[in-house]
A protein has these predicted regions:
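Polar/charged side chains located within well-ordered beta-strands of beta-rich proteins
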Residues: 24, 44, 104-107
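Conserved N-terminal entry element of GNAT/NAT acetyltransferase domains
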Residues: 1-14
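Conserved acetyl-CoA-binding loop-helix of GNAT-fold acetyltransferases
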Residues: 97-110
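Helix-loop element at the rim of GNAT/NAT acetyltransferase active sites that forms part
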Residues: 22-36
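Amphipathic alpha-helical recognition patches that constitute DNA-binding helices
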Residues: 19, 85, 89, 102
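Conserved GNAT acetyl-CoA-binding A-motif
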Residues: 113-115
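Acetyl-CoA-dependent GNAT
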Residues: 37, 42-93
Length: 115
């Protein structure tokens, strides 16, 4: 059984580029994106560099027992207005499992208590 204690977060870094683009371009995730085109490597790398330098965004790799199972992001962070936007990518192997629900719980916790 998967529990919240088995889920950890770490900040995304440039070395996560290949993993993130693979998840982002997978059909099950891509078709749910506002911008549903297949992202090319150069476009993705430029985007990732800008994300990593954006103080109004936080991106995390979500691990389940040391295995990367998805990414979670909180963007458009306004400390003044206490608002933000969030989303996640879940590795296909974990879709339909409790991992997505736990990611939602963690995201809400971070937005309410850490921003």
């Amino acid at each position: 059984m998967i529990s919240l204690n088995d889920i950890t977060l770490r900040n995304v870094n440039i070395n996560d580029s290949d993993r993130l683009i693979k998840w982002r371009n997978s059909e099950c995730i891509r078709k749910k994106m506002i911008n549903a085109h297949i992202v090319q490597k150069e476009e993705h790398e430029n985007w990732l560099r800008s994300v990593l330098n954006n103080s109004n965004a936080q991106w995390f790799i979500v691990n389940y027992k040391e295995t990367a199972v998805g990414a979670m992001y909180i963007t458009d962070i306004s400390k003044k207005d206490k608002t933000s936007t969030w989303g996640m990518y879940v590795d296909r192997r974990y879709m339909g499992s409790v991992v997505g629900v736990l990611m939602e719980v963690i995201a809400i916790d971070k937005m309410v208590f850490d921003l």
